[in-house]
Amino acid sequence: ILVDAPFASGKPWTRCLEGLVYQATTVEVLSAGTQTTVQDFPGRLGYWAVGVPPSGPMDSRALRLGNRLLGNAADAAGLEITMSGPTLRFNTDAVVAVTGAPIPLSVDGIEQPLNTALLIKAGSTLSLGTIAGAGARSYLSLRGGVQVPDYLGSKSTFTLGQFGGHGGRALRAGDVLHIPALTDRQAGAQLPADLCSALPAVREIRVIYGPHGAPEYFTPAYIE
């Protein structure tokens, strides 16, 4: 509204809003999933000296493949989905792709393929289920990327520091994400099969017991 001609010129008149047609280019979070965050590639690097560890996608390859499929810039921000995914209502047309760990995907209750550019119509609801099998993170890329401010050179979320991404935290129900107005509606492209092969096995990751292993975070039984 504020960039509309009457306001931009500083000369609005009493009834100037009557003819204004406004279309929100937003995505509303109906449910957020286990932990869904905004991340970009290569992330926030080079700030260890001031106490900021690297931030960015855990599976940068999957996010980059999604951006490549949609024709996005390599550093376009997307959503990183951990274990279970969000339900999103689109208030504008969009083209999206889901890459990474296999996860159930539907639009308005109709199952949709992964690793494919999908046209989502305004008013539609996209739902992501729970990851099954190997892998823990999937990525939802949107044509043009998620619009959030850069912080220390990146849009990536750093939850412990509470900055970057959408308010420095994982998404919550009721959040509203902004995306660019869709100008290229081309959809249907798929990633080549050799670029989206499944993980061969579930791997064990060795960890060192640290301060976040204290009882207020994890019970002894859970650590075992």
Question: Residues of each region from the PLM?
Answer:
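Catalytic cores of soluble metabolic enzymes centered on carboxylation/carboxyl-transfer
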Residues: L2-T25
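Conserved short loop/turn motifs at secondary-structure junctions
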Residues: I1-D4, T82-S84
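Conserved "landmark" site that anchors the functional core of diverse proteins
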Residues: A24-E224
